[in-house]
């Protein structure tokens, strides 16, 4: 699942891993609202990890909306993000496959926002997407090819989100 910590919303791709009952229990205990949807890759296979297709930060959400095939669910995700003031940066399946959904916003020692993404994710973005993201925060783009090719995850997967 991907958490909007500011607005206490938990976004989750419905699959065997993020079980609806467990998600609802998590949300109830921590005061979050769930947004559950089905998402698939370009080949139609289920997306198990929401952070493959979505990043939600303070002001920006990076989302592969085309992976949410059901129009009502896609509209619900989009409405939820927009209603909380997020600017949506839509990514394509190709960008998602280059880990562009696997980003994480952190803050540096001075409290300034930084967006961590792999070099592959960064290179998959358009010039306009990069310029927009850079206008909002500092981008940190390490080369994680070894991790991405051998482990299957990327930048967000490497950072423990205990904060």
Summary of predicted features, one role per range:
Residues 1-163:
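The feature marks the mature, well-folded catalytic cores of soluble enzymes
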